[in-house]
């Protein structure tokens, strides 16, 4: 049985970049495992641990084979007919092979294959010891790490994320002889920089985590995270509040500390007059603090910082955190008060001076386009067009506020607050903020109907603009954020169950963008001509039907639908189901969703596979047809019972599903289609479609054409075929 030993590799460094640490740790761990695997060294992955702190990267494996497995090799020699001469003496071929193997030819074994009997020499190659291979494995692992900005230090030419100061390599109780980046491996690690600033001797890998903990280092990120969350929640409870803990903030703090300790802090209540989102943004993003909320979710004057030490004077640590945050809060309060002096309406007047795009006019022009689209969408989903107009008119005003200039993430949020203060209706104020949702992957869509209207109009205009001026995404470049906007648009429609004609909306958006580009061309060409926008609208806003415009709308539609591929894949929807619906190009994305749901249920039926295969066969037959197919089926030309049987069954299904299809009850329609399997099977078993009689052939093709069209009334089901 193979002997196994625990393995510990720890690379000690100066503080690693917080954002790079997770990837560095993962790559280091995976690189070591991959190096062992490439060399055939057995590893028990069940207890493998990737460990890290800001000052170290470590790999801890509880069971690693002490050597590579033995390798059994076969060296093949000559066949018998060439191994001996006519007198039965060994030829030079046999003697040379034996000499190469270092044995007498008489000791060679014989085997038989398809060509006859031949000589073979079997050897056992012992595996190399793991400790001899580890230095090379470590070097490879480090070389493969994704270091964003490698650096040199001292007089060395080594490159790494930060200077390397120590290296621990223990295999069992023994130190592995190695030198990496000028540092020799040993058993000496380091404790916490301030709480235990001295060497830590490790007897073996097994007690690594416990020994480091005694030196005030929690080397397991999961343990640090659990401690951080537990302490934050406990401190917040002490003051009767609830801590706001976001995954992003916790992940950052975990990679900033080795020995976390929660510290309760506070700020002056006067700062609570500022929109709480600005204060929260400052605490979380800029300082990595955790705000404390009351039972209603409103910000209190308390917050929690995570120190990297256990201080004897916690109050002094708290004062330091409070001193850091006060200037930022003072700035936010100043910006807020300055914005209140001018008001939301005055901010909007400056949109005329801000260029949205050289070919698309100003932000005020964009607002005008969004306003028209919002008015068109609103009545389709039961929203007052006047409210839609009002919220669109105010939607971009906060972009000219001091607050948003300082905190760009608060666009929409600031507008919400300023609209309420200005006396706007609550639903209008909420919609200004709501329209930005979803802001990121996994975020919720807009909550209010009015916010959804504005969000749809905004994204439609952005998409139409991006495509009109040639700013389509390429690779990882997406300057207009079109991919994000397309998915946000699609999610809002689908998750809100809006049965909107997407192509009509894209058509309207494209018309107004075409109008905008025309106006800009005229502005540049005729600077002295003061033509009114109203006159230009009469001249240019009439929809121009052209092949180019139709192609652009189709391109936009396809771009939006393609964003849904990943959206549904994340929900476990098979690609074949998605392709089946996408081929039909439903104009309503909510209709697309319902068809996709129905296809999922249909695919579970026992008849689904057979019908999918049949439909694929029908398409192939029709594609290869070399004669003109009649528009209708002539039942008088049938000469086989299977033909009439199929037509009767098809007509029955069409009649029975007409109402369900009109009501878009696609599950019912597809369930009904399952009844066609027996007559379809009988038709293909007993009827020769490509009959020599051209009239019979054409009529049978017409029957298959009608059948194929109805089989695809919900989705192109041949995609379900295996």
From Swiss-Prot:
The record's keywords, sorted A to Z, are: Aminoacyl-tRNA synthetase, ATP-binding, Cytoplasm, Ligase, Nucleotide-binding, Protein biosynthesis
Q: List GO BP terms, alphabetically.
A: arginyl-tRNA aminoacylation; glycyl-tRNA aminoacylation
Q: Please tell me whether the keyword Ligase is annotated for this protein.
A: yes
Q: What is its EC number?
A: 6.1.1.14
**Where in the cell is the protein located?**
Cytoplasm
Q: Which GO terms describe its molecular function?
A: arginine-tRNA ligase activity; ATP binding; glycine-tRNA ligase activity
* Keyword Aminoacyl-tRNA synthetase appears in the UniProt entry: yes
The reaction(s) this protein catalyses = tRNA(Gly) + glycine + ATP = glycyl-tRNA(Gly) + AMP + diphosphate
Can you supply one Gene Ontology CC term for this chain's record? Answer: cytosol
Q: Which PANTHER family match?
A: GLYCINE--TRNA LIGASE, CHLOROPLASTIC_MITOCHONDRIAL 2, GLYCYL-TRNA SYNTHETASE
What is said about its interaction partners and assembly? Tetramer of two alpha and two beta subunits.
| Family membership noted in the UniProt record | Belongs to the class-II aminoacyl-tRNA synthetase family.
Q: What is this protein called?
A: Glycine--tRNA ligase beta subunit
Origin organism is Xylella fastidiosa (strain Temecula1 / ATCC 700964)
Query: Its encoding gene is what?
Result: glyS
């Amino acid at each position: 049985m193979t002997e196994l030993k625990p393995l510990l590799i720890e690379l000690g460094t100066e503080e690693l970049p917080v954002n790079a640490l997770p990837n560095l740790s993962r790559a280091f761990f995976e690189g070591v495992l991959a190096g062992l695997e490439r060399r055939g060294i057995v590893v028990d992955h069940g207890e493998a641990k990737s460990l890290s702190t800001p000052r170290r990267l470590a790999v801890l494996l509880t069971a690693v084979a002490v050597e590579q497995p033995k390798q059994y090799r076969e060296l093949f020699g000559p066949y018998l007919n060439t191994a001996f001469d006519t007198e039965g003496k060994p030829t030079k071929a046999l003697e040379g092979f034996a000499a190469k193997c270092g044995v007498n030819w008489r000791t060679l074994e014989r085997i038989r294959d398809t060509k006859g009997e031949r000589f073979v020499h079997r050897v056992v190659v012992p595996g190399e010891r793991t400790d001899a291979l580890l230095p090379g494995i470590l070097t490879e692992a480090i070389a493969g790490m994704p270091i964003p900005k490698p650096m040199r230090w001292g007089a060395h030419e080594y490159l790494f994320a930060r200077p390397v100061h120590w290296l621990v390599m223990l295999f069992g109780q023994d130190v592995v002889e190695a030198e990496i980046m000028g540092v020799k491996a040993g058993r000496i690690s380091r404790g916490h920089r301030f709480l235990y600033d001295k060497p830590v001797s490790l007897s073996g890998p097994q007690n690594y985590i416990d020994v480091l903990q005694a030196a005030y280092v929690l080397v397991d990120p999961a343990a640090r995270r659990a401690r951080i969350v537990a302490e934050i929640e406990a401190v917040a409870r002490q003051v009767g509040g609830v801590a706001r803990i976001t995954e992003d903030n916790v992940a950052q703090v975990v990679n900033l500390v080795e020995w976390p300790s929660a510290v309760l802090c506070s700020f002056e209540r006067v700062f609570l007059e500022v929109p709480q989102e600005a204060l929260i943004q400052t605490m979380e993003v800029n300082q990595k603090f955790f705000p404390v909320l009351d039972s209603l979710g409103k910000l209190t004057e308390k917050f929690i910082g995570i120190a990297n030490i256990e201080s004897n004077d916690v109050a002094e640590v708290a004062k330091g955190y409070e001193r850091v945050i006060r200037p930022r809060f003072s700035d936010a309060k100043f910006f807020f008060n300055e914005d209140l002096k001018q008001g939301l309406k005055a901010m909007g007047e400056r949109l005329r001076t801000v260029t949205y795009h050289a070919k698309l006019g100003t932000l005020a022009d964009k607002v005008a386009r969004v306003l028209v689209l919002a008015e068109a969408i609103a009545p389709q989903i039961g929203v007052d067009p006047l409210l839609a107009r009002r919220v669109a008119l105010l939607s971009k005003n906060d972009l000219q506020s001091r607050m948003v200039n300082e905190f760009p993430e608060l666009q929409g949020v600031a507008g919400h607050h300023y609209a309420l203060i200005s006396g706007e209706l609550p639903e209008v104020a909420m919609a200004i903020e709501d329209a930005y949702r979803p802001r990121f992957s996994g975020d919720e869509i807009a909550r209010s109907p009015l916010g959804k209207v504005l969000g749809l109009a905004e994204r439609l205009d952005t998409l139409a603009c991006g495509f009109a001026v040639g700013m389509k995404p390429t690779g990882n470049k997406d300057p207009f954020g079109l991919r994000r906007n397309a998915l946000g648009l699609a999610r809002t429609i689908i998750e809100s169950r809006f049965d909107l004609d997407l192509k009509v909306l894209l058509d309207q958006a494209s018309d107004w963008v075409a109008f905008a580009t025309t106006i800009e061309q005229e502005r540049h060409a005729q600077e002295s001509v003061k033509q009114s926008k109203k006159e230009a609208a009469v001249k240019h806003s009439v929809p121009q039907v052209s092949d180019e415009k139709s192609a652009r709308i189709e391109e936009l539609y396809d771009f939006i639908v393609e964003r849904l591929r990943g959206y549904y894949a994340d929900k476990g929807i098979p690609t074949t189901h998605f392709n089946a619906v996408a081929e039909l190009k439903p104009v309503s994305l909510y209709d697309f969703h319902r068809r996709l749901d129905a296809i999922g249920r249909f695919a579970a039926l026992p008849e689904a596979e057979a019908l999918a295969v049949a439909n694929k066969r029908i398409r192939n037959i029709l594609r290869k047809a070399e004669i003109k197919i009649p528009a209708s089926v002539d039942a008088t030309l049938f000469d086989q019972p299977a033909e009439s049987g199929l037509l009767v069954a098809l007509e029955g299904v069409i009649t029975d599903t007409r109402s369900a299809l009109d009501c878009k009850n696609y599950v019912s329609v597809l369930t009904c289609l399952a009844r066609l399997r027996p007559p379809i099977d009988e038709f293909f078993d007993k009827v020769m479609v490509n009959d020599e009689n051209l009239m019979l052939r054409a009529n049978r093709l017409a029957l298959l054409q009608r059948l194929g069209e109805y089989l695809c009334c919900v989705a192109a089901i041949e995609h379900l075929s295996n």
